[in-house]
From Swiss-Prot:
The gene is iolG. Gene3D superfamilies: Dihydrodipicolinate Reductase, domain 2, NAD(P)-binding Rossmann-like Domain. Pfam families: GFO_IDH_MocA (PF01408), GFO_IDH_MocA_C3 (PF22725). Involved in the oxidation of myo-inositol (MI) to 2-keto-myo-inositol (2KMI or 2-inosose). Keywords: NAD, Oxidoreductase. InterPro entries: Gfo-Idh-MocA_inositol_DH, Gfo/Idh/MocA-like_OxRdtase_N, GFO_IDH_MocA-like_dom, MI/DCI_dehydrogenase, NAD(P)-bd_dom_sf. It catalyses: myo-inositol + NAD(+) = scyllo-inosose + NADH + H(+). Homotetramer. It comes from Sinorhizobium fredii (strain NBRC 101917 / NGR234). This is Inositol 2-dehydrogenase. The lineage of its organism: Bacteria, Pseudomonadati, Pseudomonadota, Alphaproteobacteria, Hyphomicrobiales.
Length: 340
């Protein structure tokens, strides 16, 4: 059985997902694309795929069984609600939506539908290294997790397109999600500290240090540096009661020659997480073919929005800003407190 997919948004990430769905993965076919730039959509559409000017028409098409949303964030709410109304599984790139109120509306619609349909594009949980780290923590051999040190470094970001809010409302959401998933815990408060600014970042608020207070009492510190020049460097170490567990450096190859010892650093997120992206979609295809979703949920997208909002407030106030979540609907499983 082949899942017939429509892709909304044909920018960089949309084109990468079209490539993945058409050239890398099996049991899936891209049968439709849509973009506000009709010429670009037509240029990247696979042979035989329909091109739609309006995303809603793609979603309602009888030939489309599932949808991938890669459009501009403010357009996500309407597109997600249309997918839920049509009963079609949907993969939505982050952000789920741009406001907590919008996240609640999407969540209410999905709960009313009665079955999970939405998966959000938090890909780190599909990375083999993160999965091994998660398995170690869940086994309990190191005792309870006490602290998680997360590092998120980019060589550079697009000048003029990446704003001072984006380390907190765009970059941070990956670290916030993976912290919740690894520790099986919710964020209850956020602090932000801004050290000396990097001269490479101009007027950007860069780097930043974020402290996430978790419901269990564990703490997560996140370093975000988006103009560090040398590459895309993702690190993580969990300190537990009886030891530590950390991610390996990637790629794992260590070179020794006349110049010394060195280890290459990935150039960007695609190089570091390409296998995670493939696995993310591999699992989504299986679930979508069954009419549902199993990966990061609307609840996770809602939580990420609240954490980002609190981080922006904390950057301005200098205080610990609370994260107040609504009661978790049973559709998204037990509360993390109950699961511990």
């Amino acid at each position: 059985m082949t899942l017939r997919v429509g892709v909304i948004g044909t920018g960089m990430i949309g084109q990468d997902h079209i490539r993945r769905l058409t050239q890398v993965l099996s049991a899936v076919e891209v049968v439709a694309v849509s973009d506000i730039d009709g010429a670009r959509a037509a240029a990247v559409a696979p042979q035989g795929a329909d091109v739609y000017a309006a995303a809603g028409d793609l979603i309602r098409s009888e030939t489309v069984e599932a949808v991938v949303i890669c459009s501009w964030g403010p357009a996500h709410e309407e597109q997600l609600l249309d997918c839920i109304a049509a009963g079609k599984p949907v993969f939505c790139e982050k952000p789920l939506v741009t406001t907590a109120a919008a996240a609640l509306r999407v969540m209410e619609a999905e709960v009313a539908f009665g079955r999970r349909l939405v998966q959000v594009g938090f890909m780190r949980r599909f990375d083999a290294d993160y999965r091994r780290l998660k398995a170690t923590l869940d086994a309990g051999v190191l005792g309870a997790p006490l602290m998680f040190h997360s590092t998120h470094r980019n060589a550079s970001v697009p000048e003029g397109l990446y704003t001072s809010d984006m380390p907190l409302n765009d970059t941070l959401v990956h670290d916030a999600y993976i912290s919740r998933w690894l520790l099986n815990d919710e964020v209850t408060g956020v602090e932000v500290r801004v050290p000396r600014r990097s001269r490479r970042g101009g007027e950007l608020r860069d780097p930043v240090v974020v402290l996430l207070h978790m419901g269990s009492g564990a703490l997560v510190d996140v370093e975000i540096s988006v103009n560090i020049a040398y590459g895309y460097d993702i690190r993580g170490e969990v300190s537990c009661e009886e030891g530590t567990a950390s991610l390996p450096l990637r790629p794992a190859t260590v070179i020794r020659d006349i110049h010394g010892v060195r280890q290459p650093v990935p150039a960007d997120w695609r190089e570091r997480f390409i296998e995670a992206y493939d696995q993310e979609f591999r699992e989504w295809i299986v679930a979508a073919a069954q009419g549902t979703a199993t990966g990061p949920s609307t609840w996770d997208g809602y939580a990420a929005t609240l954490v980002a909002d609190a981080a922006l407030r904390a950057a301005e106030s200098g205080a610990l800003e609370p994260v107040r979540m609504c009661q978790r609907p049973s559709l998204y499983g037990p509360t993390l407190e109950a699961a511990r």
